[in-house]
């Protein structure tokens, strides 16, 4: 099992990256909450990882924090929640925001995430409620303000919007829905990562 990788960031196209680890290129899928914290192309980064083995593919998921990976592993234990849906959940909410929604039983927030219907949201509440009691109340509202500006991502509004739409579709949103989400928040000065962040925030 690959649990942690440290290497040079070669490519990033939300939600995927290519990481060079001693000459070997690893393709990883990251939730957007981890993607926001990536350095610029060519710089070193360290990610906690989880490998999912399927008949048709081996998928490697990366996380900026160990707590993100822990929640990912808890999510995929839930009936009806696969790795891609867990990725969408962690892209829409930070660990703290998700924990708060679970402890407050906020079904409406959970069902706004693509792929999470009422039954899935109810299962998440039943199976995960109480597992976040160790998290302080103040921690529920912690939100990273760091948004890296990467020269590898074209800041032109049309290019940023197209990349943001593609990323949202990859996370499970329907094309029409993704386009509407991006149009509501897109500004010429925003990078694609910033557009995605604002679109996901507005969706909740």
Curated annotation (Swiss-Prot):
Region annotation Domain III: where it falls in the sequence: 156-204
Subcellular location(s) per record: Cytoplasm
GO molecular function: ATP binding; four-way junction DNA binding; four-way junction helicase activity
Database matches in SUPFAM superfamilies: DNA helicase RuvA subunit, C-terminal domain (SSF46929), Nucleic acid-binding proteins (SSF50249), RuvA domain 2-like (SSF47781)
Gene3D superfamilies (UniProt xref): 5' to 3' exonuclease, C-terminal subdomain, DNA helicase RuvA subunit, C-terminal domain, Nucleic acid-binding proteins
Region (Domain I): 1-64
Cellular component terms per the entry's GO annotation: cytoplasm; Holliday junction helicase complex; Holliday junction resolvase complex
Subunit structure: Homotetramer. Forms an RuvA(8)-RuvB(12)-Holliday junction (HJ) complex. HJ DNA is sandwiched between 2 RuvA tetramers; dsDNA enters through RuvA and exits via RuvB. An RuvB hexamer assembles on each DNA strand where it exits the tetramer. Each RuvB hexamer is contacted by two RuvA subunits (via domain III) on 2 adjacent RuvB subunits; this complex drives branch migration. In the full resolvosome a probable DNA-RuvA(4)-RuvB(12)-RuvC(2) complex forms which resolves the HJ.
Family as reported in the entry's similarity comment: Belongs to the RuvA family.
Protein name per the record: Holliday junction branch migration complex subunit RuvA
Organismal lineage: Bacteria, Pseudomonadati, Pseudomonadota, Gammaproteobacteria, Pasteurellales
Gene that this polypeptide is encoded by: ruvA
């Amino acid at each position: 099992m690959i649990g942690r990788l440290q290497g040079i960031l070669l490519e990033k196209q939300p939600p995927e990256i290519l990481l060079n680890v001693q000459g070997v290129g690893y393709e990883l899928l990251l939730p957007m909450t981890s993607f926001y914290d990536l350095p610029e192309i060519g710089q070193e980064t360290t990610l906690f990882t989880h490998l999912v083995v399927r008949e048709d593919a081996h998928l490697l998921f990366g996380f900026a924090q160990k707590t993100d990976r822990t929640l990912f592993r808890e999510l995929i234990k839930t009936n009806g929640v696969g790795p891609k849906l867990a990725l969408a959940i962690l892209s829409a909410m930070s660990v703290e925001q998700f924990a708060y929604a679970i402890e407050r039983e906020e079904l409406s927030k959970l069902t706004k995430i693509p792929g999470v219907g009422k039954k899935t949201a109810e299962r998440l509440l039943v199976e995960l409620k109480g597992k976040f009691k160790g998290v302080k109340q103040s921690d529920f509202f912690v939100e990273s303000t760091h948004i890296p500006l990467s020269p590898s991502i074209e800041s032109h509004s049309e290019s940023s919007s197209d990349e943001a739409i593609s990323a949202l579709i990859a996370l499970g949103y329907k094309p029409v829905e993704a386009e509407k989400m991006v149009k509501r928040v897109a500004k010429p000065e925003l990078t694609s990562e910033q557009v995605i962040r604002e679109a996901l925030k507005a969706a909740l």
